[in-house]
Swiss-Prot record:
Signal peptide: none annotated. Its cofactor is Fe(2+); L-ascorbate. This is PKHD-type hydroxylase sync_1544. Keywords: Dioxygenase, Iron, Metal-binding, Oxidoreductase, Vitamin C.
Length: 220
């Protein structure tokens, strides 16, 4: 499993944010924040990065991510950074691209998309992520987040009706290598499941010891 999908915001919070974005946001051409190779293929709008509303949403989403143990276990985050709020209207999308490896705010090991709109509010607009042999489309429900490797080619298909509004950003992990992160996540998840089912034991202490020392060794 190289991506994580789960709910981190409730519907009421998302609806409140959508209402504020509709009434207060200053929307700019989204291509202004695209890399040189992707600029021509980005057809969306983004809220002014310096606006108080963007900073408020950034803080809310970042807090929800830091407070979610599965997000922390999967990402092993050193830094969550460069939160952008974008909306894609009819005929808008974002052609195939890979995210920049380094930004002024940090390194991109993992990318995330948090959907403020529900998948019933628009048509088209699937996020497609390429694997070695195929592409798989993903459409998020309201309040769901998808976290995936920044090393992947991906795209946002054209929206055919409605409006797709999301918060996107990047994660710099303590563990840069994807396979190492996945192994650590599986080890910790298994250990915590055993702890919940059987309670503490000397044997389980050894597993947590191995996890901690592996994290220390693999982390940068």
């Amino acid at each position: 499993m190289n991506h994580l999908r789960l709910q981190i915001l409730d519907q009421a919070t998302c609806e409140r944010l959508l209402e504020r974005l509709a009434n207060e946001a200053e929307w700019l051409d989204g291509s202004l924040t695209a890399g040189a190779h992707a600029k021509g293929g980005k057809r969306n709008f983004q809220i002014n990065y310096d606006s108080a509303l963007r900073k408020e949403i950034h803080e809310l989403v970042e807090r929800a991510m830091w407070n979610h143990p599965v997000v922390k276990g999967f990402c092993l985050p050193r830094k969550l950074h460069r939160f952008l709020i974008s909306k894609t209207e009819k005929e808008g999308g974002y052609d195939t691209h890979v995210d920049n490896a380094y930004m002024s705010s940090g390194r991109s090991d993992l990318s995330f998309t948090l959907s403020l709109t529900d998948d019933t509010m628009y048509e088209g607009g699937d996020l497609e992520i390429d694997s070695i042999s195929e592409s798989y489309p993903i459409k998020l429900k309201q309040g769901e987040i998808l976290i995936y490797p920044s090393t992947s080619l991906h795209r946002v298909c054209n929206v055919t009706s409605g409006i797709r509004t999301v918060c996107v950003g990047w994660i710099e992990s303590y563990v840069q290598a994807e396979n190492d992160r996945i192994c650590l996540f599986q080890l910790e998840s298994g250990a915590r499941a055993v702890l919940a089912k059987h309670g503490r034991s000397d044997e389980l202490d050894l597993i947590f010891l191995a996890y901690t020392n592996l994290l220390r060794r693999l982390g940068g």
